[in-house]
Amino acid sequence: MVVVAMAAAAPVFRTTPSSRRSAVAATADALAAGIFLGAGLIHMLPDSAQGYWTYGASYPWPFVICGATIMGLALLERLAWGSGRSAAPALAAAIALAAHSFLAGAALGATSRQAAILVLFLALIAHKGAASFSLAQILTDSSLSRRRAMIVQSAFVVALPLGVVLGAVATRQEQAWPLVKPTILALGAGTFLHFGMQRHRTTAQALGIARQLAPWCGFALMALIAIVD
């Protein structure tokens, strides 16, 4: 994922990129939208709720955490995409995307379903490449120097693997910290639902039957994994 993110951002820092995306990339993005929605609703949120209920929590904390995460990430994005060449919107965008990546990585590290991990990993590769490309454009269009923009971009790139490490550590310490893993899964559910809704809104108006069906295929794939995994 780190290599994909760096490769996606590199052309932006070297030259002025074209804004056109290939049809394959757009279809993969639409497929990822369905995968993220399925991961959040079918896998992570139920697993989080089961974890809380196992340890006697009667209040619906997983759903509160999930909803707050969705609204918090949406707020970060509204603050991030300001107007003008000021550095503040660019830094806010970097924080928002890094938060996305870190929470997604933590959820991936805490997930115990092997088949779901593989599908999510592939979907995150596509998403992280697109996010890295977008952030690089925002940073290079801002008033930040090239050196500072590359430092901020690097911080975004390492956010996801750091999240994976946190999620894996939390899973290994489940007996000592029983509610950490369910909390990470609830945060991850909110993050992936936000990913999915965000990407689905983008692709819903796209032309072509493949892009219209791709989110449904991604969602159906995650539903099937819930049966067999």
Give the predicted meaning of each segment:
Residues M1-D229:
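Intrinsically disordered, metal-sensing/regulatory segments
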